[in-house]
Design a protein with these regions (language model features):
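Extended, low-polarity transmembrane helix blocks
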Residues: 1-31, 42, 46-61, 67-140
Length: 140
């Protein structure tokens, strides 16, 4: 096994971790719609239940895209849309008066912005990704 093959396998492992993270977050949205909608409503989100279902769809589709390497540009866009929206509306730490709650929201905001940076960097990775549905679809 050469270095390129090792790096391709490590990239696959990273895709499984990242894609799995977003998939689980999406499934969590569907599993806990009422609870999450209550929190979103407390943050002023209109139609909170529909917003939770919609963001769950973004997470599942984006996570699956990453995991499978199938149309990863579209998956990246979906995840960036989710992260931008939730960061500005839900984790808007600058509006929180309580210092402990503010720190918690700031941590989530920072994590989300870092994930956006990572996702944007993946747009430079050559396609099709190794060991992906995209690579299977392009084989002769």
């Amino acid at each position: 096994m050469d270095l390129l093959q090792i790096l391709q396998i490590l990239f696959l492992i990273g895709r499984i971790i990242v894609g799995g993270y977003f998939l689980m977050a999406g499934f969590n949205h569907f599993k806990n719609v009422k609870m999450m909608a209550g929190y979103a409503a407390s943050k002023g989100t209109p139609s909170a239940e529909a917003a939770i279902i919609g963001t769950g769809i973004l997470l599942v589709l984006g996570g699956a895209s990453f995991l499978l390497g199938y149309h990863p540009t579209i998956g990246t866009i979906l995840l960036v849309i989710f992260l931008l929206g939730v960061s500005m509306k839900i984790h808007n730490f600058w509006t929180v008066a309580d210092p402990q709650a503010r720190m918690n929201e700031q941590a989530h905001f920072g994590k989300n912005i870092a994930m956006i940076g990572f996702l944007l960097m993946t747009l430079m990775i050559n396609r099709p990704w190794p060991y992906s549905l995209g690579s299977v679809a392009t084989r002769p």
